[in-house]
Amino acid sequence: MSAPRSFGATILLAALLLPSNLLAVVAPDQARRGGVEESPVIRFEELPREARETLALIKRGGPFPYKRDGIVFGNRERRLPVQSNGYYREYTVPTPGARDRGARRIIAGGSGEYYYTGDHYNTFRRIRE
């Protein structure tokens, strides 16, 4: 009976003594899902023309062509850095030929950062201006 307790205490002690930066190495997938790792970057000039126009509209405060532009983006999959609810807002980037809003969006963060997704929230790239 004392062996399991001793083993458990050893594991607990080892975990407490590990530097916190080593813990990120142990679980990189969890760190990535939590938005800990930096998002890939896309330069403003590399964005599709419609995305550059949408970003200009966001910075001007509108008017926006889609009713759902400006709604809260929940970041439920945690592909962006984790923030409090309401921190992120989403805006539609028109997709030529699409009959609906399409898959492209710009997500605006509360501190002035912007992210582009061309695949309906599967991947994000931070916009570098």
Regions found by a protein language model. Name each.
Residues 21-23, 84:
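Cytosolic catalytic domains that perform sulfur/thiol-centered chemistry
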Residues 25-79:
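N-terminal secretory signal peptides
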Residues 1-11:
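Bacterial N-terminal signal peptides that target proteins for export
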Residues 10-21:
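Bacterial N-terminal signal peptides
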Residues 59-129:
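Functional cores of ribonucleases/endoribonucleases
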Residues 3-4, 15, 25, 121, ...:
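Extended, aromatic/histidine-rich regions of cofactor-dependent oxidoreductases associated
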